[in-house]
A protein has these predicted regions:
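Small/aliphatic-rich secondary-structure junction motif
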Residues: 1-52, 149-201
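Gly/Ser-rich helix-loop-strand patches that form or flank binding pockets
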Residues: 1-4, 19, 24-28, 91-143
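Short, surface-exposed alpha-helical segments at coil->helix boundaries
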Residues: 19, 51-64
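A structural preference for short, hydrophobic beta-strand core positions in alpha/beta folds
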Residues: 35, 78-81, 134, 184
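Generic structural signal for helix capping and beta-alpha/helix-loop junctions
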Residues: 42-45, 89, 111, 142, ...
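A short helix-to-beta-strand connector/capping loop
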Residues: 72-78
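Charged docking surfaces used in two-component/phosphorelay signaling
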Residues: 81-89
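Active-site-proximal loop->helix
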Residues: 145-147
Length: 202
């Protein structure tokens, strides 16, 4: 990995759970860190002032995070406060700076998961041309528990196609950087036409 690590934040404590991971990747690979936050404008004249304030807040927020992370990354720390659709702007920024990885926080699969996962994280993994690392922080008593990265093993899911194998080089590089074990997994499914009560696996 040669490009910087892009970490996508939305200003919440939850999203900042991705920061320790982004910083650790930055240090392990000796690359820079790019802090990105996107203000999504409301397209009506009534919200013109609100949009301007949201943009100013986003700029101040990115500047503060960059300052707070000073000296903690493996290279130069940069930041970008963007305006527009979050997924599109993050993907554009990643391409512009040649990002090696996009790191972001995501909820789990609870009843509200799609509210965030569907709008940003899911969009990133569907459209980004670089690896996307999604961090799921623990929540206890409505508090976000930020945990430091502890990578002992990396699992790569394969399906026998070249598309799935595209993850191998990235996974191997991460395994070397973290001195972690690398596991390859492929699940073989039985065709429905060979299902039989005499074959327990079907």
């Amino acid at each position: 990995m040669n490009g910087p690590i892009l970490v996508a934040l939305d200003g919440s404590q939850f999203s900042e759970a991705a920061l320790p991971w982004a910083l650790e990747f930055s240090r392990r690979f000796g690359v820079g860190l790019d802090v990105v936050s996107v203000a999504e404008p409301i397209p009506t004249l009534e919200y013109t002032e609100w949009n301007a304030e949201a943009q100013r807040w986003t700029e101040d927020y990115v500047e503060r995070v960059v300052s707070d992370c000073s000296g903690d990354a493996g290279g130069e720390i940069t930041g970008a406060a963007l305006v527009g659709p979050a997924v599109g702007k993050i993907v554009e920024r990643a391409a512009e700076i040649g990002a090696a990885v996009i790191v972001a926080a995501t909820h789990g699969h609870g009843p509200l998961a799609r509210a965030w996962l569907g709008s940003v994280a899911d969009g990133l993994i569907r459209t980004a041309s670089v690896p996307v690392l999604l961090v799921r922080p623990r929540e206890e008593d409505e508090e976000v528990v930020v945990e430091l990265p502890d990578v002992e093993a990396i699992l790569v899911s394969l399906d026998g196609t070249p598309d799935s194998e595209a993850a191998l080089d990235h996974a191997a590089a991460a395994a070397r950087a973290f001195d972690a074990d690398l596991h390859l997994v492929q699940v073989v499914t039985y065709p429905s036409e060979v299902a039989s009560p005499y074959l327990p696996q079907t």
